[in-house]
C-alpha cells in the first residue's frame, strides 16, 4: 500500500453523505483515516443529525469555520487547516463536492504537498455566476486525482486538458450512501408524523442564494408553488438560510413548512413523493436513484446526466414555466432509469484508485505534462 494516512474533509450537509462511504472503504483496506470537519454548516439540524443518521464517528478534528462571506469563510478554513495539515502530515487529502471548505482545503493541500483527491470532479454547470462552479473548477485544477461520478463529467475534464492518468470514472458516491441506508429510511415514520400519503404530495427544497436571497425571485417561486399546491399539496422542509425570508414574504396556502429533516427522514420523504421540486444538485441525483420525478428550479445543472439518463427535468425560474413543467410531469412522469456505475460501489473504486496510485514522490503532479506534450511553441 503506497498511501497509508488519508485526511477526509467534510464541511456541510452534502459532504457528509459523500465522505462516509469513502472513509469506510479506505479503512477496510487498512488506511489510517483522519476525519476533519470544517464546521461550515454549524446549525444542529443541518449538522449533528446527519452524523447520527449516517453513523459517522465524531470528527477527529473540528475547525469551527462558521458562516460569513465567501472570502471570510474560505480564509478561516485555510488558516485553520494549514497548521493541522502540517501536524498530521498525511499522504493524501480527500475533498468532496463544491463548497467553500472544499476549495479552501484543496488550496492548502496543494501548497503543502500531499496528494489531493477531488470526489465529484468534472461537474460543470457552465454558469460562472455560481460560487460552486468557481469552487469546482479551481479544486479540479490543483487535484492529483479527479474522481468523476459519470462519463460526462470525465469528458468535461478531458476537454479541459487534464491528463488521462488523473481522470477516473468511479460512479456516484452519494448513491452508495443512499442505497446503504434505503431500508432504514423506508422504515421511518416521517410520513405518518406529517399525515402524508405515499404518492399524494410534492416535496420542495430551496436553498440556493439566487432563489432565496433575491426577494423578487423568491416571490416568483412561491407564486408558482402556490399554483401547483392547488393540484398537489406541497411539503417544504425549511433550510436555515431560507427560513427568515420565507417568513417575511409569506407562504401560499397548500404549502406546509416543516423543520429541516434528518438524512433518513429526508430520503423517506423523497421516496414517497409524487414529485420533488428542488434547486439542489444532490436531490437531483437522489431522486434519479429512487426513480422519483424531479423538477429542478434552476436554468442549468452541473448534473446533466440526471436529465439525460434519470428522472430530472429543468424548469428554470420563470413562474409560468415552472407551473407548466410541473403539470406536464404530473400528467406524464419520466420513466425511472439510473446511470451506469450508480451501483453502490463508487467508494470501493475510489479506495482502489487512492491506495494503488502511488505517492507524491512517484506520481506526476497536476501541472506535469503528459508524455509527448509540449508547453509552448518549439
Where in this protein do the model-derived segments appear?
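Active-site and donor-binding regions of nucleotide-sugar-utilizing enzymes
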Residues: 5-27, 50, 62-163
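Short alpha-helical donor nucleotide-sugar binding micro-motif in glycosyltransferases
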Residues: 81, 85, 268-273
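C-terminal amphipathic helix plus adjacent low-complexity
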Residues: 331-378
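A nucleotide-sugar donor-handling region in carbohydrate enzymes
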Residues: 41-45, 64, 142-216, 315
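A donor-sugar binding/catalytic signature common to diverse glycosyltransferases
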Residues: 95-96, 107, 118, 146, ...
Amino acid at each position: 500500500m503506497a498511501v497509508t494516512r488519508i485526511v477526509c474533509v467534510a464541511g456541510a450537509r452534502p459532504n457528509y453523505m459523500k465522505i462516509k462511504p469513502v472513509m469506510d472503504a479506505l479503512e477496510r483496506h487498512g488506511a489510517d483515516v483522519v476525519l476533519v470537519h470544517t464546521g461550515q454548516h454549524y446549525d444542529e439540524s443541518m449538522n449533528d443529525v446527519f452524523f447520527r443518521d449516517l453513523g459517522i464517528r465524531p470528527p477527529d478534528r473540528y475547525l469551527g469555520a462558521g458562516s460569513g462571506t465567501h472570502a471570510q469563510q474560505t480564509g478561516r478554513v485555510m488558516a485553520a487547516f494549514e497548521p493541522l495539515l502540517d501536524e498530521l502530515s498525511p499522504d493524501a487529502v480527500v475533498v468532496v463536492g463544491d463548497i467553500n471548505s472544499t476549495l479552501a482545503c484543496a488550496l492548502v493541500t496543494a501548497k503543502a504537498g500531499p496528494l489531493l483527491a477531488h470526489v465529484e470532479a468534472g461537474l460543470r454547470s457552465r454558469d460562472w455566476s455560481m460560487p460552486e462552479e468557481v469552487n469546482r473548477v479551481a479544486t479540479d485544477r490543483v487535484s492529483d486525482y479527479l474522481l468523476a461520478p459519470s462519463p460526462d463529467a470525465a469528458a468535461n475534464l478531458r476537454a479541459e486538458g487534464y491528463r488521462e492518468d488523473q481522470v477516473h470514472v468511479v460512479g456516484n458516491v452519494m448513491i452508495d450512501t443512499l442505497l446503504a441506508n434505503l431500508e432504514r429510511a423506508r422504515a421511518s415514520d416521517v410520513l405518518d408524523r406529517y399525515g402524508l400519503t405515499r404518492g399524494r404530495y410534492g416535496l420542495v427544497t430551496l436553498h440556493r442564494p439566487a432563489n432565496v436571497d433575491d426577494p423578487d425571485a423568491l416571490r416568483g417561486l412561491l407564486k408558482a408553488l402556490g399554483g401547483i399546491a392547488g393540484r398537489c399539496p406541497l411539503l417544504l422542509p425549511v433550510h436555515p438560510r431560507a427560513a427568515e425570508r420565507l417568513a417575511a414574504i409569506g407562504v401560499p396556502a397548500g404549502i406546509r413548512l416543516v423543520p429541516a429533516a434528518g438524512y433518513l427522514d429526508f430520503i423517506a420523504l423523497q421516496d414517497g413523493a409524487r414529485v420533488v421540486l428542488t434547486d439542489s444538485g444532490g436531490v437531483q441525483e437522489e431522486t434519479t436513484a429512487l426513480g422519483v420525478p424531479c423538477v429542478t428550479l434552476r436554468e442549468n445543472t452541473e448534473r446533466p446526466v440526471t436529465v439525460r439518463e434519470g428522472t430530472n427535468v429543468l424548469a428554470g425560474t420563470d413562474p409560468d414555466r415552472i407551473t407548466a413543467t410541473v403539470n406536464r410531469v404530473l400528467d406524464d412522469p419520466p420513466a425511472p432509469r439510473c446511470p451506469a456505475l450508480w451501483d453502490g460501489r463508487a467508494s470501493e473504486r475510489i479506495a482502489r484508485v487512492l491506495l494503488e496510485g502511488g505517492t507524491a514522490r512517484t506520481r506526476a503532479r497536476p501541472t506535469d505534462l503528459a508524455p509527448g506534450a509540449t508547453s509552448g511553441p518549439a
